[in-house]
Amino acid sequence: MSSQPRGSGTQPGPSQSPISQRNFRYEPARSGYTSPGQYSTYSTSTADRVGCLTAVRMSAFAKLSRFTRRLVHIRQMDFEFALWQMLYLLIQPSKVYKNFIYRKRTKDQFARDDPAFLVLLALSLLFSSIFYAYALGLEKIGFFTFFLWSVFVDCIGVGVVIATVLWWVSNRFLRKVRDQDVEWGYCFDVHLNAFFPMLILLHVIVPILYPTLIDSPAFLSILLGNTFWFLAACYYVYITFLGYTALPILHKTQYFLYPISFIFMFFVATLTGGWNISRTALNFYHSRAEPHKFAPQHGGL
């Protein structure tokens, strides 16, 4: 009877090494944002099926519904924090985006879930419209028309277009991880952040100075008025750059600064050509708010 050496069936040979039997596979780069339980539940409404170690990832529709519900509950809005954000957008905008990163780690979203900032921005547009109504000599109906255009077209409408374009560009070309993408709501928040300093420059300072210092064909008047438009555009681009640079899932965000070069060349061209941008803009605003005053008159001889 032949006997087999003890342990001969259990000792692996050179080709049977546990290390050589491991299956190695390529793992794509990840963002590092994981739930405590290393998995998440994708929810479209409530979190009744979620355990204590599971993070909830709400759908875009669920986030929008929650945002809309809070829009009609004034007591749930944190206006004090929204005012703090507005202040630091003027003096230290990079500090504002640190809160967006904290929100991602605690609520699994970069975008704001509190509509207080949007409400205060609309109120700012309401009060700034008073300055334009005075500078343009608008009537009551013209004032409200100007305000509605400013909110729903200049702020929200243009913001939706810009946010959609940058959302697509960021996810298509600038994303360096696969397990996270840029939220459209965050892109719209970046637009609102960049829009507020522009509002202060163009909707407060320009209409105040326009009747006395800007509304003139003199070079200094053109230089002063066009400088405000140049600064507003550069500030918008810079805060937009900061917003996308704050996302750890993106790279090559320096591309967002490239428009500043074209803005500067356009600024120099307007000064060389003697084009008063403020005059053109205010005439356009006036014709939009009170179109009946700019309608062509058809009268017989």
UniProtKB/Swiss-Prot annotation:
Among the GO biological process terms of this entry, one is: receptor localization to synapse
The residues on the Lumenal side of the membrane are 137-142, 215-221, 276-301
Pfam families, per this entry?
Answer: UNC-50
Localization in the cell:
Golgi apparatus membrane
Q: Spell out which residues lie on the membrane's Cytoplasmic side.
A: 1-115, 164-193, 243-254
**Source taxon at top rank:** Eukaryota
The transmembrane segments are 116-136, 143-163, 194-214, 222-242, 255-275
- Entry membrane topology: Multi-pass membrane protein
Q: Where is this region: Disordered?
A: 1-22
The answer to whether UniProt assigns keyword Amino-acid biosynthesis to this entry is no
Give the main location: Golgi
Q: Name one GO cellular component term.
A: Golgi membrane
- Alphabetic keyword roster: Golgi apparatus, Membrane, Transmembrane, Transmembrane helix
Annotated family: Belongs to the unc-50 family.
Q: What does this protein do?
A: Required for cell surface expression of acetylcholine receptors in body-wall muscles.
Protein name per its UniProtKB record = Protein unc-50
